[in-house]
């Protein structure tokens, strides 16, 4: 079966069961870790999961693996191994490049969350979040809570639907990419920036407790609580083996930031501690890096199988510059003129912001042609990309008060050392209109259940 047939079959069962959306959620609204970082301790949840068939999952996982491999190769293939040049090309500022060069890994991490939409023909990538600070890894709890409801549990059993324990896989990512195994019992410091620590502490505490259940000895802290002395990094009198970084590139370029970062990054370079994940993820996660993969002039760098994956999963994406670019049909056009004339089919995105910040939808009802042109011209002076619009198919979901509603989803597919390691979905009611799908605009969070991946032939 596939996404569509599984969804149709489950909606038929729900209609016969006659359960309310509240009953379908079970105890999900009371889950501690899932709601610890939500406003008022309560999130908005979809009353049913989304589904993927085995063949769909196999192809999607393969496409993401090819994309990540291609992304990892860009500094070498395009810049001769000059990582600073790569970082500048994808829009990092001078101070950001300097910070990244102080804390790099031997290779790009495989821990990522790909935010995708399905347009009916397949999945298209909107952005790629890379590194230790990605959200959505706690999706395993959403799956477990929903599967406590008998109607979904029975449906999942009959159709062979399952999920991946993303938290367990995250622990595996941390250990493997830091050079440890579980038997080493490394001491982990889950480390935030001081100014954000108090707000994030409830969630960090819950996460460390869950990691502890999986055998990982982790403690929440902020960077100012770490001490570098005697050839080690210390937290509360314990030598730390791994720093799991949740602070961001924007934090480390602020005033007086070097006082906090320099001792720790120097200790990492000396091999006294591992950082999961290093700051180089900020360059790989830039949307301009996706533009480099999309640009016609770089296609010769990749094998045919990789190109097939990129063509399937990556919408037409270009850095906003005064230059000629190639369209999907091979036509050469002036980028600024083309973008200005095709607002309804394009979106502007800052290269390094997340959560929909700074995104301009060319088709927005309240955006005039003059305003769109002004946004395009302004983007020439900042690191921006322009991307082809993707028109997603909507999902039917039971809602409070009875009946169903249509939701516009963004799928968050998580990858790690073992490839696909789970996923979730954020979805916004269609009545909200064409707005960015995020919590600020009323997005609900849902689970992903899937068939076992089909064998690769």
Residue ranges and their predicted role:
Residues 1-457:
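Preference for protein termini
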């Amino acid at each position: 079966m596939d996404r569509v047939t599984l969804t149709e079959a489950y909606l038929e069962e729900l209609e016969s069961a006659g359960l309310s959306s509240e009953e379908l959620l079970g105890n999900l609204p009371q889950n501690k870790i899932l709601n610890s970082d939500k406003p008022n301790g309560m999130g908005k949840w979809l009353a049913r999961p989304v589904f993927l068939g085995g063949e769909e999952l196999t192809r999607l996982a393969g496409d993401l693996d090819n994309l990540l491999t291609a992304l990892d190769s860009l500094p070498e293939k395009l810049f001769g191994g000059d990582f600073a040049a790569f970082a500048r090309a994808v829009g990092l500022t001078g101070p950001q490049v300097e910070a990244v060069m102080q804390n790099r890994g031997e290779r790009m991490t495989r821990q990522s969350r790909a935010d995708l939409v399905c347009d009916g023909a397949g999945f298209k990538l909107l952005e790629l979040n890379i590194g230790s600070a990605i959200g959505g890894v706690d999706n395993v709890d959403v799956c477990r809570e929903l599967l406590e409801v008998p109607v979904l549990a029975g449906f999942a059993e009959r159709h062979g639907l399952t999920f991946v324990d993303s938290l367990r896989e995250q622990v595996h990512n941390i250990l493997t990419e830091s050079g440890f195994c579980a038997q080493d019992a490394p001491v982990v410091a889950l480390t935030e920036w001081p100014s954000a620590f108090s707000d994030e502490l409830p969630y960090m505490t819950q996460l460390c407790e869950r990691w502890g259940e999986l055998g990982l000895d982790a403690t929440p802290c902020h960077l100012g609580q770490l001490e570098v002395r005697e050839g080690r990094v210390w937290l509360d009198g314990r030598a730390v083996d791994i720093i799991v970084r949740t602070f961001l590139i924007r934090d480390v370029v602020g005033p007086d930031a070097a006082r906090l970062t320099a001792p720790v990054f120097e200790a990492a370079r000396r091999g006294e501690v591992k950082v999961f994940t290093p700051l180089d993820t900020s360059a790989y996660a830039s949307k301009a890096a996706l533009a480099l993969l999309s640009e016609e002039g770089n296609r010769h760098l990749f094998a045919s199988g990789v190109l097939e994956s990129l063509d399937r999963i990556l919408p037409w994406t270009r850095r906003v510059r005064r230059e000629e670019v190639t369209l999907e049909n091979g036509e050469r056009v002036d980028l600024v003129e083309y973008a200005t004339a095709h607002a309804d089919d394009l979106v502007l995105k800052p290269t390094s912001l997340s959560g929909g910040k700074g995104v301009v939808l060319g088709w927005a009802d309240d955006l005039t042609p003059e305003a769109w042109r002004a946004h395009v011209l302004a983007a020439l002076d900042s690191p921006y990309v322009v991307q082809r619009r993707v028109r997603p198919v909507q999902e039917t979901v039971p809602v409070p008060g009875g009946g169903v509603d249509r939701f516009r989803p963004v799928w968050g597919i998580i990858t790690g050392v073992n490839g696909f390691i789970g996923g979730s979905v954020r979805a916004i009611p269609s009545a909200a209109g064409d707005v960015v799908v995020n919590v600020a605009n009323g997005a609900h969070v849902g689970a992903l259940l899937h068939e076992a991946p089909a064998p690769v032939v």
